[in-house]
């Protein structure tokens, strides 16, 4: 897991990133940057990618990166005071009809929302993206 400050003015994608009055990117800006690098159209039909919870208008000052959106990651995000968590694997792989706090995934969503933390995941879209996970692994093993 990695805790990194969000860039103030990234140079990615065809449109310049917007920012809040304090100069921070917004949740929506970060989503757009991730989707520019890993377009949702590249995702497998069975996969779930995108913004799981969070207000696109909220500022993002810091981001926690992780592989899975598990309880330990949520606790680390809350303790670190980050505004957003980006994971590779999705919280919900299939559609859901509830987010009650009576099950682990529902509790995760509730904890994130109460803490004001957005959750974004990019799974197979990032795997398939040019320069993404598959390309990086292929390069590493010499393919």
Protein language model features and the residues they cover:
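Hydrophobic structural segments
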Residues: 1-143
């Amino acid at each position: 897991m990695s805790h990194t400050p969000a860039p103030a003015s990234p140079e990615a994608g065809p449109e310049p990133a917007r920012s809040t009055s304090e100069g921070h990117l917004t949740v929506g800006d970060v989503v757009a940057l991730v989707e520019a690098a890993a377009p949702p159209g590249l995702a497998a039909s069975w996969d779930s990618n995108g913004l799981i919870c969070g207000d696109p208008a909220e500022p993002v000052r810091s981001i926690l990166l992780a592989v899975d959106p598990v309880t330990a990651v949520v606790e680390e995000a809350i303790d670190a005071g980050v505004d957003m968590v980006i994971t590779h694997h999705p919280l919900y792989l299939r559609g859901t009809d509830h987010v009650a706090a009576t099950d682990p995934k529902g509790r995760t969503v509730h904890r994130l929302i109460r803490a004001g933390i957005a959750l974004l995941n990019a799974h197979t879209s990032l795997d398939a993206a040019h320069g993404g996970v598959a390309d990086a692994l292929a390069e590493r093993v010499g393919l």
